[in-house]
Every structure is written in C-alpha cells, then in structure tokens.
C-alpha cells in the first residue's frame, strides 16, 4: 500500500470517528425529528420515539437515524485528499439530503408493509436499501471529481 493510500485511509478513519461521535451525540434529537416527521407525513399519532400504527407500535431507535451510514459517507467525502472544502461541503449537504430522504421513505415502507407480512422480514429486507445508496453516493463523488478534473487517477 502506497503512502498516499495510507494517508487517505487514516484521514477517512479520523473523519469517520469525528462525525460518528457528533452524530451519536445528536441521535436522540434525530430520533425525535424522524418520529415527528413520519407521524405528520403518515397522519399517525406518536409518543416520544414511538409511532402508533393501528394496534401496533413502531419504535424509532438509534439504528433508524442512519448515523453510521452518514458518518461513513462524511468520512469518505472529507477524507478525500486534494479537494477544496467548498466541494466537500456542497456534496455533503447533497448526500446527507439523499440519505435522509431515502431513510424516511424506507421507514414509511416498513410502516406501510409491516402489517401485511412478518414485521422482522419487512424491516430487514427494506433496511438494506440505505447502504447501497451510501455506496452509490461515494462512487458518484469520485465520478464528479474525475469529470470536473478536480482529482486525477493514474
């Protein structure tokens, strides 16, 4: 592994842990915002971080915030060497918006289809969607940087 690759991995890890720590501190607030947003969108009642769906209760818990996926995404973006900060910030706002909207849609699908089939099956199958979205955003980041000739690969 070249020195440049080692530096990139180190930068990625540092940024990942910084963003993960920040997001973990905000996780309770993010859960509250998700609960309120989802209950308003679906016209459902809620209590704390629980949404009442008929006779069932769906809890919006820590993994529902996508903190890990967001931190991985941000670590990747901010760890990218030789890219001006303005591009990193702009793309981070774009990417976090996509992840958040996808997450809200994911939870809506879980809520809507959890009554039809086994809840755990629905949850596990639909929850898989966020990770490929984050991977696509990382690929698209490099694609944009190459297209704009901000970074060059050999």
Curated annotation (Swiss-Prot):
Chain ranges passing through the membrane: 6-26, 57-77, 91-111, 125-145
Signal sequence region: none
Species the sequence originates in: Methanocaldococcus jannaschii (strain ATCC 43067 / DSM 2661 / JAL-1 / JCM 10045 / NBRC 100440) (Methanococcus jannaschii)
EC numbers: 3.4.22.-
Residues annotated as the enzyme's active site: 64, 106
Protein name: Probable archaeosortase D
Domain of life: Archaea
Membrane topology value: Multi-pass membrane protein
Gene Ontology CC terms: plasma membrane
Subcellular location as annotated: Cell membrane
Family (UniProt): Belongs to the exosortase/archaeosortase family. Archaeosortase D subfamily.
Function: Transpeptidase that recognizes and modifies its substrate by proteolytic cleavage of a sorting signal. Following cleavage, a covalent intermediate is formed via a thioester bond between the archaeosortase and its substrate, which is then transferred and covalently attached to the cell membrane.
Upper lineage: Archaea, Methanobacteriati, Methanobacteriota, Methanomada group, Methanococci
Cysteine pairs bridged by disulfides in the record: none
GO molecular function term, any single one: peptidase activity
One annotated GO biological process: proteolysis
Keywords for the protein's UniProt record, in alphabetical order: Cell membrane, Hydrolase, Membrane, Protease, Transmembrane, Transmembrane helix
